């Protein structure tokens, strides 16, 4: 860039600020607009679809420029944040009236995808997370900060696979990692991932900074004193949050150590396949959360989303939640709680904005209404006997002083921002009331003064007025000017009149002319004082918000249990998974016909079900509903089944459906095999495994061999396994593996048309019905007829399904040539024909040299 001296004074100011924020788009306030210049302007014009223009010249070149009206900036910021961009907001802090040259400007806040807190820029029912990671390929420290709630979690994770799975679960808006990590890492593909200096992750400075933030001598009380890598990552997050927010962060009050051992682990593929909160098309319709989320508050919805994505293995916690849901179902108690919870609103994020000192007037109005609703909610909770409910009620305190303060201070429907005033009630502050009265009632004062002066002087043509140059005045016609009282001081002489000022009018002028600006300054100061009073109470208020969110989720689970006919599952020590009349919670909501419920029984003697049946027969639905029932049980919810008895699981794996990973250069079959490999390496006897059509992406015998070996391996692991397949050969596994049983989805044909019955019955399916399904899908009749001919021929010549089962683990000669095997080298054929005894030593040597040149 050219020397600053070559630029105009304003551009010099711009470049000094821009150099401090090279990675952010600079919104540079000029009057009623935020302007962007140079490359920022070009980028913003493209991203926001705004006009790119030019502004004069600086350093001999025209300046590319794009502008955004300041009053509509929120919409543009929201779009940029969604696109993963960061913005530095540069405001005018000097007074243009008293400044020579460019008005003083300063970057007052930095908006990044992971640190945004403005309500307009956030999805109210989704967490917005900032993450940092440090370590090596063996062990990583991961820290997660939700600046909109104050949640600050750390954990240490072994291996890339587990780290990437955890990042997929958390889906942070921004991810920070050390600048000295090599290029080409998997996490670089994530939107919002960017590098930070290695020293930002330094343990010693991080430890000191965190202790200072939490006002503690050490971090032992948070259970993370020994997590060196995680503490380094947390220190990086804290520094980044301070850098972007430009304020203290009083709502960050501690760390929480998360342990993978406490949770049911789901990898990224399982999370996608089960469509917990995002469907396979990337939307939110027809997901598990869309069905079971009727929370009354946004913070409740966010908590439910965290529960779904992080099921627990703590039986005591799960049963306490179940007891609470049962208590709320009794006499329909949840019905009286939910309307009260709706009045509470999103207290969690309001408190965070108060902590960040950027709470809007409407935030305080909502907090006022929430605090006013708490006493009635406390009364409703007091007779409820569930221990966990009582614990929650203990944290839902009432705040009569704060409630009264906000009631007195904030008008019923305040404006969106404090900038133009009009937020505080009349009577809250006497000085503000006087200033507002002066500002708003100047006209009436002047009318009253004019009437009094006419009466006092007896001059009927006297007028009181205002001039921007000379201020307030009393005007008399020139012929009456000599009759002016002694206290009239001449201010201005006109052609036909004289203007005067009096001590009373001068005193009023001094007050009135500055009253509006002074009133606004006073109101802003009082508003800041209100925020400070609330900040002093943040700790108990945040505990209350946390308890309210959980109460909302549990009341929601009670409502869903009643209206969706969910029943309480029972956890047992005996290894088992028994479901009576289980249903898919999402599919049953979208069907026009009644859902066909089915049983499932797995125990120590039966660990695997081989599931056969026609396409569209319901195999995948049956498998997914099992996983969703198990998952719902592990968040403390009731489940869509007549009854359910299960032992705790450690992981849920799914290998259901695949698509090409074009960006990663992986075929459908490669994706399928990668997911299968992950399951075979990590499943245990406490894992639930769903395997659907393993091996279908390659040749028949290769696919069958892989599916067979995978099923044998899982049977050996004794994992809870549902293995759906079209390879009927696998049904003979039940004869050699005592923990394997066969079931099938029933169907029948009528008048050459297939009827799916969707009942799960013991034993293998009798036939595939593939041609009937093809006919149902609209495949042309001649193609179906020709397919029947081919099928008859293939069934007559193929190996029978009853071929004897070879022993597992013993390699056998291939029964199908490998399409990718190399053809025999011609030299091998010559060598096979060669008779060594017929060669002389010289001939043998010449032949050897000849072969060597041909290799």
Swiss-Prot record:
InterPro entries: DNA_mismatch_repair_MutS, DNA_mismatch_repair_MutS-lik_N, DNA_mismatch_repair_MutS/MSH, DNA_mismatch_repair_MutS_C, DNA_mismatch_repair_MutS_clamp, DNA_mismatch_repair_MutS_core, DNA_mismatch_repair_MutS_N, DNA_mismatch_repair_MutS_sf. Keywords: ATP-binding, DNA damage, DNA repair, DNA-binding, Nucleotide-binding. GO terms for biological process: mismatch repair. ATP binds at residues 613-620. GO terms for molecular function: ATP binding; ATP-dependent DNA damage sensor activity; damaged DNA binding; mismatched DNA binding. One of its GO terms (cellular component) is cytosol. Pfam families: MutS_I, MutS_II, MutS_III, MutS_IV, MutS_V. This protein is involved in the repair of mismatches in DNA. It is possible that it carries out the mismatch recognition step. This protein has a weak ATPase activity. NCBIfam families: mutS1, PRK05399.1. Belongs to the DNA mismatch repair MutS family. This is DNA mismatch repair protein MutS. It comes from Azotobacter vinelandii (strain DJ / ATCC BAA-1303).
């Amino acid at each position: 860039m050219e020397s600053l001296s070559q630029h105009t004074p304003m551009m010099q100011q711009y470049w000094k600020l821009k150099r401090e924020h090279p990675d952010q788009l600079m919104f540079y306030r000029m009057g009623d607009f935020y302007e962007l210049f140079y490359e920022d302007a070009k980028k913003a014009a493209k991203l926001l679809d705004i006009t790119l223009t030019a502004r004069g010249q600086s350093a001999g070149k025209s300046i590319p420029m794009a502008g955004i009206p300041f009053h509509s900036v929120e919409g543009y910021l929201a779009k940029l944040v969604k696109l993963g961009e960061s913005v530095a907001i540069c405001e005018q802090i000097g007074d243009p009236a008293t400044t020579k040259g460019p008005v003083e400007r300063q970057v007052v806040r930095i908006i990044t995808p992971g640190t945004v807190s403005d309500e307009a820029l956030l999805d109210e029912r989704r967490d917005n997370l900032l993450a940092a990671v440090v370590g090596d390929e063996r062990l990583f420290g991961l820290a997660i900060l939700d600046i909109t709630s104050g949640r600050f979690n750390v954990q240490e994770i072994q291996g890339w696979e587990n780290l990437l799975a955890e990042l997929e679960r958390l889906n942070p808006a921004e991810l920070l990692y050390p600048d000295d990590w090599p290029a080409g890492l998997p996490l670089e593909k994530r939107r919002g991932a960017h590098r930070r200096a290695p020293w930002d992750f330094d343990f010693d400075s991080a430890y000191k900074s965190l202790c200072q933030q939490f006002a503690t001598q050490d971090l032992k009380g948070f259970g993370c004193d020994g997590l060196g890598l995680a503490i380094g990552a947390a220190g990086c997050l804290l520094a980044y949050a301070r850098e972007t927010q430009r304020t203290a962060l009083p709502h960050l009050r501690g760390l929480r150590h998360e342990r993978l051992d406490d949770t049911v682990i789901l990898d990224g593929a399982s999370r996608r396949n089960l469509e917990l909160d995002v469907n396979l098309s990337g939307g939110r319709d027809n997901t598990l959360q869309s069905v079971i989320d009727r929370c009354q508050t946004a913070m409740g919805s966010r908590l439910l989303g965290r529960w779904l994505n992080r099921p627990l293995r703590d039986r005591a916690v799960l049963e306490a939640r179940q007891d609470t849901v049962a208590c709320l179902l009794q006499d329909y108690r949840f019905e009286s709680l939910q309307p009260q919870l709706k009045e509470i609103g999103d207290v969690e994020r309001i408190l965070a904005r108060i902590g960040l000192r950027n709470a809007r007037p409407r935030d305080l109005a909502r907090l006022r209404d929430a605090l006013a609703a708490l006493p009635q909610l406390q009364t409703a909770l007091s007779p409820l006997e569930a221990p966990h409910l009582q614990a929650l009620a203990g944290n839902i305190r009432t705040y009569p002083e704060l409630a009264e303060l906000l009631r007195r201070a904030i008008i019923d429907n305040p404006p969106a921002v404090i900038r133009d005033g009009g937020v505080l009630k009349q009577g809250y502050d006497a000085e503000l009331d006087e200033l507002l009265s002066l500002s708003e009632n100047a006209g009436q004062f002047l009318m009253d003064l004019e009437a009094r002066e006419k009466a006092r002087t007896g001059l009927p043509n006297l007028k009181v007025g205002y001039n921007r140059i000379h201020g307030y005045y009393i005007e008399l016609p020139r012929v009456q000017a000599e009759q002016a009282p002694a206290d009239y001081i001449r201010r201005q002489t006109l052609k036909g009149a004289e203007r005067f000022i009096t001590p009373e009018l001068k005193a009023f002028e001094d007050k009135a002319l500055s009253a509006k600006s002074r009133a606004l300054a006073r109101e802003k100061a009082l508003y800041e004082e209100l925020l400070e009073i609330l900040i002093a109470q943040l700790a108990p208020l945040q505990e209350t918000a946390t308890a309210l969110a959980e109460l909302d989720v549990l009341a929601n689970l009670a409502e869903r249990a009643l209206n969706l006919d969910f029943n309480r599952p029972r956890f047992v020590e005996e290894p088992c998974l028994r479901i009576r009349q289980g249903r898919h919670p999402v599919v049953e909501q979208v069907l026009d016909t009644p859902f066909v419920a089915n049983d499932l029984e797995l125990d120590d003697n039966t660990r695997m079900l081989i599931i056969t049946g026609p396409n569209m027969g319901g195999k995948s639905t049956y498998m997914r509903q099992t996983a969703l029932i198990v998952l719902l049980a592990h968040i403390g919810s009731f489940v869509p089944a007549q009854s359910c008895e299960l032992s705790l699981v450690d992981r849920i794996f799914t290998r259901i459906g695949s698509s090409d990973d074009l960006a990663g250069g992986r075929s459908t079959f490669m994706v399928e095999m990668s997911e299968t490999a992950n399951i075979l390496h990590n499943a245990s006897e406490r894992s639930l495994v769903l395997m659907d059509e393993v091996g279908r992406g390659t040749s028949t015998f290769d696919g069958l061999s892989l599916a067979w070996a995978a099923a044998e391996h899982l049977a050996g692991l004794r994992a809870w396994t549902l293995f759906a397949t079209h390879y009927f050969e696998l049904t003979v596994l039940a004869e050699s593996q005592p923990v394997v049983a066969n079931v099938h989805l029933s169907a029948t044909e009528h008048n050459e048309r297939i009827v799916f019955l969707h009942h799960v019955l013991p034993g293998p399916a009798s036939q595939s019905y593939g041609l009937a399904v093809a006919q149902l899908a609209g495949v042309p009749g001649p193609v179906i007829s020709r397919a029947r001919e081919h099928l008859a021929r293939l069934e007559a010549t193929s190996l029978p399904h009853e071929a004897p089962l070879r022993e597992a683990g013993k390699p056998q000669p291939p029964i199908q040539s490998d399409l990718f095997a190399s053809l025999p080298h011609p030299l091998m054929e010559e060598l096979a024909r060669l008779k060594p005894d017929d060669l002389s030593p010289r001939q043998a040597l010449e032949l050897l040299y000849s072969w060597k040149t041909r290799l």
